[in-house]
Amino acid sequence: IDLIDKSKEVILFVPGAGMDHRVANLFDLNPKLFNKVISIDLPGHGGTPPSNASTIEEYAKFISVCLEELNLTDFHLCGHSMGGLVCMSLASLNRKIFKSVSLFNCQYPLFVGSALLDGSSRNLDGAADFLTKYGIYKMPSIEKPKKAFGIKGSSFYKKTNGKVITPYGFKDIDNPEREIALYDLKKLFNQVSKDILAVDMNACMGFRMDIKDINKLNDINIIIGEKDKLVSQKK
C-alpha cells in the first residue's frame, strides 16, 4: 500500500472461487496510468489463514475491514465470478468509496451444478478440469521443455500417455500437451485447505441479496466473455 502512486489509478481485484492474489499478477495494464493491481486474499486463500468465513457476505466483510485498516478509498473495484458476488456485497455496504465497480463473467444468482459441487469436495483435480474446460477458450502458450525440466517435473515431457504429475498428485491423461498448458493455471486452485473450492462453490449457491441492497448497485459494469461456457449471457 505504501508503494501506491496516488497520481495513478488503483484497482482492487477479487478473484474467483478457489483462487487468490496470484490471478492479479496476470493483469497487464499501462504502468503510466495504473498502479499494480491489488488483491486481498480471502480467508483460506493464498497467504491468509483459514477462518470460519464461508459465505459471500463474510468474505465481503473481511475485505471491508481490511480496507478500513489500510485506509484505502477512491479506487476501482472488480471481481471475477465468485469475486463478482463479493464485489456486489461490498458495493452494497459502501458504494461511495469505489470509483467504479466491474463484474467479470459473473451473474446473480450464481448457480453451481451438482457435478461441480460434488467434484469440488471429492475430486479437486476433476473440478479444476471442469472449470478450465468450460471457462478457458484460448489455451495458454505451452512452455517448451528444456534440459532442466524445472518445477513442472520431467514426467510431463517423458510420457505421451499414462500417469503424470498434477498439482494434486498423479492421474491418467489422454492429452499431455493440454495438461502442460493448463498446469500453471490449475495450480491457482491449490490452497492450504483442499476444501476451500467447495466452500466457495457453496458460498456462491447460498448468496442472495435483499432488493433494497440490489437497488444500491447502480452504475456498475458487467462484462461477460462470449466464449465462457460457465456463464449464461441470457441471464
Predicted regions span which residues?
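Conserved alpha/beta-hydrolase "acid-adjacent" motif
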Residues: 229-235
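Short beta-strand/loop motif that positions the catalytic acidic residue
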Residues: 216, 222-224, 228
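Conserved acidic catalytic loop of the alpha/beta-hydrolase fold
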Residues: 58-75
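Active-site acidic short loop of glycosyltransferases
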Residues: 6-8, 71-74, 95, 217-219
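Conserved alpha/beta-hydrolase "nucleophile elbow" surrounding the catalytic nucleophile
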Residues: 15-17, 75, 79-81, 225
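Conserved hydrolase catalytic core segment
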Residues: 73-112
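Conserved alpha/beta-hydrolase catalytic His-Asp/Glu region
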Residues: 112, 117-215
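Conserved HGGG/HGGXW glycine-rich cap/lid loop of the alpha/beta-hydrolase fold
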Residues: 2-49
